[in-house]
C-alpha cells in the first residue's frame, strides 16, 4: 500500500507517465530568467513561458514534483510556520500539465482516478468546488465522475462588482491567460472544527484542499474582455505534504514521516524531551528550505533572496536557543535531511559540505549578537506600555543585532504582543533595500513582443547564409509591419540565419543583411521564442518575403567565441582550484572581454588566481579540438555535463566538450580548437554580492594589449625609481619602507613640539570658582597629538579643567580633559559635546577625557569663548 511520502511522490509521477505525460525534473528554486519572482512558488512556474506561448517543448503533457519556497513578498508564510498544521517555507508541489492537449474532462478524470484508484481514498471523504458559472465542470463532476450534487460546491466572486475575483478563478496577472478552477477537498472528520468551502467556518481544519485544477481557457485583455484561448491548457497542483498526511492517517503535515524524522533528530541533538514543542517544527521546516536554497545557489546576504535565506536561518537559530541549545546545532541537521530526502534529491548529498559550511558561518555570525539582542529586547519589553513594540525599537534590533523584523514579531507573538510594522518600514526607508517582490506575474503579457516564427540557426558552420524575411517589427511601437522603410529602425526575422542570438552570456552577432538595392545593418540579435530577431537600421526598404544574404561580422564573432570558449575553461579551472561548490551565477562574453560571476564565499587569493590562470592557459596550449554532440539532457548530465544557472534546456541538448577538461551543456558558438584562443589573462577579481565573486579576463589580442600596457607601466615605474624592470619592485618596497620611517619620525617630532607647546600653555590658566581652567586654540596642531598634550597638562596642573581646539583645513579637532578630583562636578564628555555642537560636530568619551570633531573652523573662537560661562555654572 502507498503510504510514505517518497512512495506518494513516485506513485504520482508514475501514474501520469502511464497517461503519456513527460516526467520533468524539479527546476531550481531560483526562477531562471524571471525577475518578477523571488522564488519558485508553484508547480507551473517552470512552464510559465510555455503557457504564454513564448516557449515550446517537445511534449504537450508534463508532470513534476516541483520544489517550492514561500517566504518572501506576497507569499510570506514565515511567521505562521510551526504554529499551524500546514504552513511551510519549503514544500513540494505535485502537478500535471497540458499545453493545448487534453482539457477539462480528462484533467478531472485523471485527478479522481489517482485519488480514488491509485491511492484508494474513500469517495465519500471527498468534495469538490467549481467556479459558480462553470457549468461544464459542474456537469462533468456530477454526470461522468458521479460526485453527488451536494458534494459539488459552486464558489462565486468575492463581491458583485469584482467579476472573476474568486478562489475558483485563476489569473496569471492583470492580463493574459486565466480561467476557472476546480478544487478537491478532503474531509478529516467531524471531530475537527471547520465547515466546507464557501461556508462561514471554511477556515477551520476539517476540510482541506488537496488538489487544484486550473482550466486556462481565456485571455484577459486590458479592457476586461475575455477572449477564448485557441488552445486551452491545464495547470494542476497538489501539495505532497498534505496528501501524505492523509495517506499516513494524520492531521498535521508535521506528523508525516519526513517531518517526524527531522523533529526527532532535532530533539535528540538539543536534548529536548517535548516532541510537540513548536520550535522543533520550526527548525524541521527551516532546515529544508535553507538547505535547498543553498543547493540552488542562494547564499545569506542583506538583500534579495539572500536576505530571505538569512531570515529563515536566524529564525531557526533563535528557536534552537528557545530550546536551550548550546553551541552551533543547525548545520548538523543537514545529514538528517539527506537521510530523508537525499534519494529523491541527490544534489543534497553532493553539496552537503557547502550547505553545512554556509549554515555554520551564519550561525557563528548571528550567535555573537543573539544573546545581546535578547537582552535589549527584554529591556524593551520590560518598559513597554501597551501591547505594541515601537517600530523604532524593532529597527534598532535589526540594525544593531541583526534581528529581522519578523523574528522580533515571532518573539512578540509568543508573548501576545505585536510590532509596529509601519513604523519599522518608515525607519527602514533610508536603509538598504530588501527584496519584497510580488510573486504574481504583474506584467501585461499581451504587450510583450512575440513571434510565432521558427528560425533555423545555421551559424555553427556558416558566416553567411541566404534566407527569407518572414516577419518585421517597427522599433517605435513594436508592431508587426509589412515593410521597414529606409532609415527606419526595426526587427527582421528570417527563416534561416547565421547570426547567433544572445543567450547563455554570449552576446548576439552583428553584421549585414544584403538585399537588392542596399542593406539592413544588424547591431544585435536576440531571441523571441524560437525566432531570431535581428535588430538594427534599414538602409533600403525591407519587405516581407524578400530574399537576403545574411552575413555576420566575422572579426567580431571571432573575438566573441574566443572569450566564450575561454569561459568554459575558466569555469572548470575554478571548480578544480576552489572546489566543486563553484557554479556559474552569470556571465558575459563580448568581443572585448569575458566576465564570469560564480559562487564562492570568500575572496580568491593571489595564489589561487595564479593557479586558475595557469591551468586555463595549459589547456589552451594543449590545443583541444572542440567536440559537439546532441543528446538527451539526462544522458548529458550522467556524463558530467554542467548545466548553467538561469538557463532553460529542451529535452535534447547540445553538449560542448573540450578535451578531457571541460564538458558543458551549451548552445553557443566556440573556437574549433582551444589553441585558437591564444592565451587568457585575468584582469580583476572582486566580490559583487554575498557569496558571489566576479572575474574579468581578456583573451587573444586583448590579452596581448593588456600585457603590453602593464609592461609599459612597469617600465615607467622603473624609470621613476631609477631602477631596471627586474629590480623595480624591490626598489619600490625600499622607498615605501623609507617613507613610512620618515613619516614616523615626523610624527614623533610633531608630538614633541606639541608637548613643548602644551607645557608653555600652563602659564595661560585662569581660575573659575577656585578651579584652574585652561582654554586654548592651538591653530594647526595635529588632532592625534592632543591626547598626549592633555595628559601632560593634567600632570602639571594636578587639578583642573582643560579645553583645547585645533583646525587643519576644514576639519576641527576638540579635546577636553578633567582631573579625577573634579569629574563629579564636570564631565569631559559634556564639555566637549557642548563645544562641538557650535562647530558643526559631535563627540564624547570618558568623564576625564573626551574628544570630538567638527567642520566649521570659523566658529572655534566663539565656541571657546562660551566655555567660561558654561564652567562657571557647572562649578558654582
UniProtKB/Swiss-Prot annotation:
SMART domains in alphabetical order: tRNA_SAD
Cofactor note: Binds 1 zinc ion per subunit.
Top EC class of this enzyme: ligase
A biological process from GO: negative regulation of DNA-templated transcription
Binding-site residues, Zn(2+): 564, 568, 666, 670
Cofactor(s) the protein needs: Zn(2+)
Principal localisation: cytoplasm
Database matches in InterPro entries: aa-tRNA-synth_II/BPL/LPL, Ala-tRNA-lgiase_IIc, Ala-tRNA-ligase_IIc_anticod-bd, Ala-tRNA-synth_IIc_core, Ala-tRNA-synth_IIc_N, Ala-tRNA_ligase, Ala_tRNA_ligase_euk/bac, DHHA1_dom
Protein family (similarity comment): Belongs to the class-II aminoacyl-tRNA synthetase family.
Domain notes from UniProt: Consists of three domains; the N-terminal catalytic domain, the editing domain and the C-terminal C-Ala domain. The editing domain removes incorrectly charged amino acids, while the C-Ala domain, along with tRNA(Ala), serves as a bridge to cooperatively bring together the editing and aminoacylation centers thus stimulating deacylation of misacylated tRNAs.
Primary role: Catalyzes the attachment of alanine to tRNA(Ala) in a two-step reaction: alanine is first activated by ATP to form Ala-AMP and then transferred to the acceptor end of tRNA(Ala). Also edits incorrectly charged Ser-tRNA(Ala) and Gly-tRNA(Ala) via its editing domain.
Name of the protein described by the UniProt record: Alanine--tRNA ligase
Species of origin: Colwellia psychrerythraea (strain 34H / ATCC BAA-681) (Vibrio psychroerythus)
Gene name, Swiss-Prot/TrEMBL: alaS
